[in-house]
Design a protein with these regions (language model features):
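Extracytoplasmic
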Residues: 34, 64, 74-77, 84, ...
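An extracytoplasmic/periplasmic, membrane-proximal ligand-sensing/linker region
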Residues: 183, 190, 200-213, 218, ...
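Ligand-binding clefts/hinges and TM-proximal coupling segments of bilobed small-molecule sensing domains
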Residues: 146-162, 234-306
């Protein structure tokens, strides 16, 4: 009898060990599928964070790729975080992206950054000159005024300098302050500043929130100075912000740069392919969650020419019938 009991116990132990052995690989396979990427965006009051969060959540909910959106400190800082390996994806203005890759302008002192490539260009972000003073009608009217021009060394800062320069003005012609979008909006509301440069996709959360409590005005760039500005930089394009976006008295003419998602070169081709394809195969669904989704297009996504595309992104675009030149692969 004792032998029978011992035999039964031995068999139970064998079955238990087999069950444990069989379950381990299944768990391992499951965890291996869920790759994790961190996506640095922008401040909470800007479009980068709002839209980036939508994209990250959509990809995470519909694929085996986990993407987490975090707040960021602007294009230059996002490039630096990518280069340091602290994040794998990051929003960046197209002009700042080129400065980083070439080691010019904002990156002249630190040198070229070669650790990133393009995942997709998503939409145009406008240089918005915001004021609550109806007497400020042109850029020239900013002379002698207190103006927020973004953090020193940021993309916004250089955009502001470019616009002022088109009018023959410099930073010395204004009283500059260096604030984020959200802080600029608060300062405008409290009448601590006269105007602010905000470079983000319209409608921008900070400006929308401001417009709910008071009348806001956007300063237009006239045709003559628009031509000067466009001739000075290949990264700008003319753009009109319709009056109904913020409830301004009239449409406003300004310039725009592209909002681009950059990715570290060492992220796998499969992960980048999944990220890009999930976004552009589901534009309608994403548009229901954020207005910028309606601006997504494959043609614009694959239109960058100054920085190479990640192989995973290039593969997807070419499968859709688009051509990525060899020098951009």
């Amino acid at each position: 009898m004792k032998k029978v009991i011992a035999l039964v116990l031995a068999l139970v132990m064998v079955f238990a060990l087999c069950a444990c052995g069989n379950s381990a690989p299944a768990s391992s396979d499951s965890s291996a599928k869920k790759e994790a990427l961190t996506f640095t965006t922008g401040g909470e009051a800007g479009t980068y964070y709002a839209f980036g969060s939508v994209l990250a959540q959509y990809v995470s909910n519909n694929t085996d790729l986990s993407v987490t959106a975090i707040t960021g400190n602007g294009s230059k800082a996002n490039v630096e975080d990518l280069d340091a390996g602290d994040v794998q994806l990051g929003f960046c203005q197209s002009d700042v992206m080129s400065y980083a890759y070439d080691g010019t302008n904002l990156f002249a002192e630190t040198g070229a950054v070669g650790s990133f490539s393009v995942a997709a260009a998503l939409y145009k972000e406008q240089v918005q000159i915001v004021t609550m003073n109806p007497d400020i009608k042109t850029v020239a009217d900013l002379k002698g005024k207190i103006v927020s021009i973004g953090a020193q060394g940021s993309g916004v800062y250089f955009n502001a300098i470019d616009v002022l320069g088109a009018y023959g003005m410099t930073e010395a012609d204004i009283t500059p302050v260096y604030q984020s979008f959200g802080d600029s909006a608060e300062s405008l509301k409290d009448k601590k500043i006269d105007a602010a440069f905000i470079v983000a996709g319209a409608p921008t959360t900070a400006i929308v929130d401001l417009s709910t409590s008071a009348q806001v005005y956007l300063v237009s760039i006239d045709d003559e100075h628009m031509d000067t500005l466009l001739a000075s930089s290949p990264y700008y394009s003319a753009y009109t912000i319709a009056a109904d976006v913020y409830g301004t008295p009239e449409d406003v003419q300004t310039v725009a740069v592209a909002a681009v998602v950059l990715v570290r070169d060492d992220v796998s081709d499969d992960d980048v392919y999944t990220f890009v394809s999930t976004i552009f195969d589901n534009i309608d669904a994403i548009s229901e969650q954020h207005g910028k989704g309606a601006e997504l297009s494959l043609e614009f996504a694959s239109s960058m020419t100054s920085v190479p595309y990640h192989p995973g992104a290039a593969k997807y675009y070419e499968e859709q019938g688009l051509t990525i030149p060899d020098y951009l692969k």
